[in-house]
């Protein structure tokens, strides 16, 4: 199993992105009296920045996701500009860590198997920031470890190795009250992939609600999730996102999922 995801951003006086999903982002800079993109689109939570703020240098995103199909994952992502302001187009670096556990009925061993996954990645990329949209792309390497409670000949996703990893995130405000965000990543290690698309309508100042769809998998499992999200809820300097919905897994069958994501800028 893999949970990594994705981040978007919008601003009252403008729109932007930082990414997660990430669980990555993009962010632009502009005068406070102009309609410009915000300082750090959160591709992970979809939470929008309300004002232009160039004082922060890095964005930290955290997420946790659980399913009724016996899986639980958490991740933390740090994104920072290589030079210049994070609210302007420019090169970026991203470091991500993921850990989780899962269990499934082992067909080849006639017993329930529990798996443990740890993963870390380092990537470099570039982020383009426009008035009401942002796009970022990254490339780098990831190290991933998957261990099983018992040997399962039917599961090829086991062991530790390094792979090439690419990721991209997009965020836009098509209108003053709508948002769209997308995140995707792929690693050559176990052919792991993750993608998420969110649409949102602003129901309060900077708060969006709408549908989301996720597709994720690797050489062993394939899964999709359809649900709804509430993004942009703020608690002081922290922006939050909540989501829940239906999950369909090739190995585990159908079930439900929920996720909580947060972002803070430093």
List each model region and its residues:
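Cleavable N-terminal export/targeting peptides
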Residues: 1-55, 266
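Outer-membrane beta-barrel "beta-signal"
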Residues: 32-36, 75-76, 228-233, 253-266
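Outer-membrane beta-barrel proteins and related beta-barrel translocases across Gram-negative bacteria
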Residues: 32-69, 77-83, 116, 141-142, ...
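Short loop/turn motifs that connect adjacent beta-strands in outer-membrane beta-barrel proteins
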Residues: 45-57, 81-92, 129-136, 173-179, ...
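Transmembrane beta-barrel architecture of outer-membrane proteins
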Residues: 57, 71-75, 117-121, 161-165, ...
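Outer-membrane pore/translocation modules
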Residues: 89-192, 213-215, 244-246, 259, ...
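Intrinsically disordered, low-complexity segments enriched in Gly and acidic/Ser/Thr residues
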Residues: 192-227, 234
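Short, exposed beta-strand-loop hairpins at the edges of beta-sheets
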Residues: 247-251
